[in-house]
């Protein structure tokens, strides 16, 4: 028996395809999304339509973003769903979701995301947060834990800070491997993200916040003093009421915001060329992501 084949489609590892097939789990996920007629609903990675069909039954229409041309073809020729679908056959990592939003109809985005690109895809989607009402995603359980984590725990990192700065994070439910075909080697979870209507004390530059977090959690066992010694002095840290002896996982979101604003106000012009190049590279580079088909490894997020 081919465990990687479901409803006549061979799961493709390069797309991180693991298809939901448990009806009870599917029903619970759709209940959590709570789609209604007239809403601007977008599904990422509809696959074989496990969520697509019940969402259309409730909402009446749906836009989907699907990279796999075989699956996009199936949806275009689906005898019941095709007439209610708008299909974008493209890479969600490159898709401009703002094109689908209007002032009257902010986006409601959901999907069983490919776990091997989940982190960069979340960061990409957050760039459209002003156009989004909410998002519901199936992710690796460990990723949801990191998104929701607070200071003083191992799961806390860049993903926690950058997500919580921009959204409310609500873990919704956990799902075991047996709900999928082929079954992944990790547990999964649903998370609800609701962009903040107003960010209190916003940072001067969100890219600076991202850069500070990358620098900190790439060296999470170092103290803040040692991590940022080329960018800020211990006396300056004290002026910001930040304990230089703390490690990155012990700083709050507000303290990272202070560090980011300090870097903006005091650009590291005097930093060695090598250090400046490292920071520039960190700004643009995403760390390795989770792989649904393998046991996860520690990450800098």
From Swiss-Prot:
NCBIfam families: ksgA (TIGR00755)
Organism: Colwellia psychrerythraea (strain 34H / ATCC BAA-681) (Vibrio psychroerythus)
Keyword hit for Hydrolase: no
EC numbers on record: 2.1.1.182
Family: Belongs to the class I-like SAM-binding methyltransferase superfamily. rRNA adenine N(6)-methyltransferase family. RsmA subfamily.
Residues binding S-adenosyl-L-methionine, per UniProt: 18, 20, 45, 66, 91, 112
Polar residues bias: start-end ranges: 287-301
InterPro entries with a match to the protein in the record: KsgA/Erm (IPR001737), rRNA_Ade_diMease-like_C (IPR023165), rRNA_Ade_Mease_Trfase_CS (IPR020596), rRNA_Ade_methylase_Trfase_N (IPR020598), rRNA_adenine_dimethylase (IPR011530), SAM-dependent_MTases_sf (IPR029063)
Chain's role: Specifically dimethylates two adjacent adenosines (A1518 and A1519) in the loop of a conserved hairpin near the 3'-end of 16S rRNA in the 30S particle. May play a critical role in biogenesis of 30S subunits.
Pfam families named among the record's database cross-references: RrnaAD
Gene: rsmA
Protein name stated in the entry: Ribosomal RNA small subunit methyltransferase A
């Amino acid at each position: 028996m081919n465990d990687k084949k479901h409803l006549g489609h061979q799961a493709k590892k390069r797309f991180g395809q693991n298809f939901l097939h448990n009806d009870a789990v599917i029903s619970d996920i759709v209940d959590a999304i709570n789609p209604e007629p007239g809403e601007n609903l977008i599904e990422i990675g509809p696959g074989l339509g496990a969520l697509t069909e019940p969402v259309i039954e409730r909402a009446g229409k749906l836009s989907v973003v699907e990279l796999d041309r075989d699956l996009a073809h199936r949806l275009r020729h689906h005898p019941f769903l095709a007439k209610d679908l708008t299909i974008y056959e493209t890479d969600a990592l490159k898709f401009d979701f703002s094109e689908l939003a209007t002032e009257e109809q902010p986006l409601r985005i959901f999907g069983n995301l490919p776990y091997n690109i989940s982190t960069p895809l979340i960061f990409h989607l957050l760039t459209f947060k002003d156009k989004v009402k909410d998002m519901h995603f199936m992710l690796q359980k460990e990723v949801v834990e990191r998104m929701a984590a607070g200071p003083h725990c191992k799961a806390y990192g860049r993903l926690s800070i950058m997500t919580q700065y921009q959204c409310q994070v609500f873990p919704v439910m956990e799902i075991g491997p047996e709900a999928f075909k082929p079954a992944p080697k990790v547990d999964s979870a649903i998370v609800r993200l609701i962009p903040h209507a107003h960010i209190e004390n916003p940072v001067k530059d969100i890219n600076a916040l991202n850069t500070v977090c990358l620098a900190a959690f790439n060296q999470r066992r170092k103290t803040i003093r040692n991590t940022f010694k080329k960018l800020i002095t211990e006396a300056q840290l004290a002026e910001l009421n930040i304990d230089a002896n703390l490690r990155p996982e012990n700083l709050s979101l507000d303290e990272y915001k202070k560090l980011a604003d300090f870097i903006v106000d005091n650009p590291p012009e005097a930093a060695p060329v090598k250090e400046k190049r490292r920071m520039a590279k960190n700004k643009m580079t995403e760390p390795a992501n989770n792989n649904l088909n393998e046991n996860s490894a520690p990450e800098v997020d």
